[in-house]
Each structure stands twice: as C-alpha cells, then as structure tokens.
Amino acid sequence: MYHLWIKCLAAWIFLKRCNGVHAMPAKAPMYPNEPFIVLWNAPTTQCPLRYKVDLDLKTFHIVANPNDSLSGSVVTIFYPNHLGVYPHIDERGHFFHGIIPQNESLTKHLNKSKSDINRMIPLKTFHGLGVIDWENWRPQWDRNWGSKNVYRNRSIQFAKELHPELSEDKIKRLAKKEYEKAAKSFMRDTLLLAEEMRPNGYWGYYLYPDCQNYDYKTKGDQYTGKCPDIEMSRNDQLLWLWRDSTALFPNVYLEIILRSSDNALKFVHHRLKESMRIASMAREDYALPVFVYARPFYAYTFEPLTQEDLVTTVGETAAMGAAGIVFWGSMQYASTVDSCQKVKTYMNGPLGRYIVNVTTAAKICSHALCRKNGRCVRKHSDSNAFLHLFPESFRIMVHANATEKKAIVKGKLELKDLIYLRKNFMCQCYQGWKGLYCEEYSIKDIRKI
C-alpha cells in the first residue's frame, strides 16, 4: 500500500510538470540573484601555488573553494575514509569496518562522523555543498548487482552464522531485511547528523538519484536514454532518503564513446529529467535544489568536451531547471605545469566563455520573466530550447588589467528575445513568491521560510 501511494504521488507530480505547472516553488538560490551557478570541485591547488598557473576560474563566473582545493567552504566532499566508519570493500578488495552495515556499530560511526564533520567543516555557518560519496554499496538489496553482489553474499553469510537453524529461503529473506534496515540507518542518520551540525549546508549523497541508463554501449542507434521503469520505481521507494536530503547530486559524466552524439543528449536529458522528478516529490514545501556533477573532460580521459557536448551538459542542465552544475576533476588536472596550462587554455577558450554565456542568460531570463524571484525552466522539458545569450543582442568580452581579469557581457534584451523566452520558458518561483511571473508574495510560503 505504501509503495502504491508513492507511485500515485510521483505520477501526479509528473503530470503537473508536463502540463507546465510546477507543483511547488524552488528553494532560494545558493547565492542571491544567481539562478544557475557553476562550481569547481577539482583538486587544482597545485596549479596556482606550485606551478604559478592561475586557472582563471573567477574570471569566468566559476565558484571555487579557497585555493582551488577539493574541499572547503563552497564544496566539501566526503569519501568513504573521510566520514565515520563506513563499512565496505574497496576496489582493491580490502575490508573496512565489518564490510556490511549490519556488522558495524552505528553509534560508533556517528561519533566518528561528528568529529570528522567538525574537522573538515570547522565553520558552523557553512553554506556550501556537503556531498557524501558512498558508492561501494547501495541501500536497496536489488540494486547490489555485479561487483556489489558481494554485499548480498556477505549478508546471507552473516545471517546464517547468527541463525543456523533457519532454512535457506528464510535466511535470504532475513539477510535482505537486516541489510536494508542497517543500510537505511547508516545513510539516514549520517545525513541527519550532518544537517543538525551544519544546518545551512546543502546535504545529500553523490549519484543519488541514478537512473541506470548506461546501455548506450550496447543499444547504439536504438538507445533512447530513458530510465528503466524498474529503476524509477526503485527511486520512488527511496522517498525516505529524498525527504532527509537538502540537495540532490546526480551526475552526467560523458564517456568518449558519446562524443558529439545524439545519444549523449539522450543520456543527459533523461538523467536530469529523473532528478527533477525526484526533487519535486521529496518535500511538501519546495523542490530540492539539484546540483549536477559533470566533468569538463570526457570520463577517464584528459580530452576536453566539444562545444556540442558543453551544450549537452551545461546547457541542458540549466534549461531543465537545476540550481547548478559542479565540475569534478582528478589529480591529473594539476599533476604538471602542462596539465595546469591545458586546463587554463580550455577555460580561456570554449569552456569559460560558454559558462559565462549560460550563467548570464539564466540571470537575464530570471530578471526578464520572473522579476528575479524565480528561475527559468523549459515549458516543455523535451524541447530543444536553451538559455543562451542571443548573439545579435549580446557579446562576451574579457578585460584584464594589472590586478584582475574579468569576463564582461555587453548588450540588452530585445523584444524578439523576450518573446522567445516567454514562448519557451516558464518561471519556477522561489519560496515566498507566486504567480505566472513570480510577481506576488506568497504569505503561506513566507511563513515556512
């Protein structure tokens, strides 16, 4: 009965969005008057400090941690060894903390997590992204396939040792029940602790939600990009996780096999569509902010995204109504002076200019359509409308002097531009505002803020 209720709720929200009506307002943006932001989550500290290569992140409207560090006041990412005593098996086959969640003390984990949060985020007024990256196992038994099947096998073995008198069938049922109960407690209580300690942060788990639409390698031209129905149903069953999250962190990493292809857009679009669906069903008062993880280079390579794929990732993310995009990167970006220079060249070329284009266009649309009280979202999510600066009306220039380098947008919105925006985009008002153009105070929402 509970699962049926969740499905009905999800279907209702989906229909509301399809009809061009947002079921609920959005949370106010992370920074005032910035409806769509781009954040940097790559360990590139060595570029400016060691190699004296400034990546010019600030120049091109990218928000980064102080010294371009991986974790800090803007984004802090918690890997398995950074937060509590996370039970798991790593990629090398090493065992940690009882391997499975039902074989480790939750109290011990939370006590350690508390000290880890204080260590990694000393500022109690932290207002950044708190991203927990736990990918070794999934909280749902049926999603632990492939290499993750070891957690099911270990759980069965654990249950058998505790209850040798039970039949195989009962052992498996018990193992599943105890595993999912413990996994839920670990994830939920960790999240609630983090939110209690740093209540102004945006907390959630990396790669949640996922939609498992990775079959582009086998489907070829038959690939649709759609999330399998079973995976959407499983996401519905994680309502407890969405309700306790204060942000969602899906990813849209592109492998090089997808370079400049129709399949790349299908892959990204449906992952975003599922994330926005989950964001709308998580709470009653506002849709969760969605910060989408992407890479400026193709996954597992050091090859920059093409202009087309920048549109596919950054452009699609903004048009679908996400709060921002987070560029993640590896140590390779800052491994040598040449690596740093390669990132800088890309930043000063297609990447930086496109980021300025989209972030500025999102801001202009928010001003023109939503009176700065909401963000622009496609009227029809499957359309090909993008939040881009109109080339006949705007131009991007980069000015530099002895102290700073800045990308500046010059121009003004023409009537034909405004007509295009009104035809293709609608406003998702921030909490406290309502109306077609977010022109009215919403007393009900203001009381909730």
Swiss-Prot record:
InterPro entries: Aldolase_TIM, Glycoside_hydrolase_SF, Hyaluronidase. The keyword Amino-acid biosynthesis does not apply. Residues 427-438 form the EGF-like domain. It holds the Pfam family Glyco_hydro_56. Its main location: secreted. Keywords: Disulfide bond, EGF-like domain, Glycoprotein, Glycosidase, Hydrolase, Secreted, Signal. Disulfide bonds join C47-C340, C211-C227, C365-C376, C370-C427, C429-C438. Glycans are attached at N67, N103, N111, N153, N357, N401. One of its GO terms (molecular function) is hyalurononglucosaminidase activity. Residues 1-23 form the signal peptide. It comes from the Eukaryota. It catalyses: Random hydrolysis of (1->4)-linkages between N-acetyl-beta-D-glucosamine and D-glucuronate residues in hyaluronate. It is found in: Secreted. The active site is at E135. Monomer. Snake venom endo-hyaluronidase that degrades hyaluronan to smaller oligosaccharide fragments. In venom, it is not toxic by itself, but increases the diffusion of other venom proteins by degrading the extracellular matrix. In addition, it displays antiedematogenic activity. Belongs to the glycosyl hydrolase 56 family. This is Hyaluronidase-1. The lineage of its organism: Eukaryota, Metazoa, Chordata, Craniata, Vertebrata.
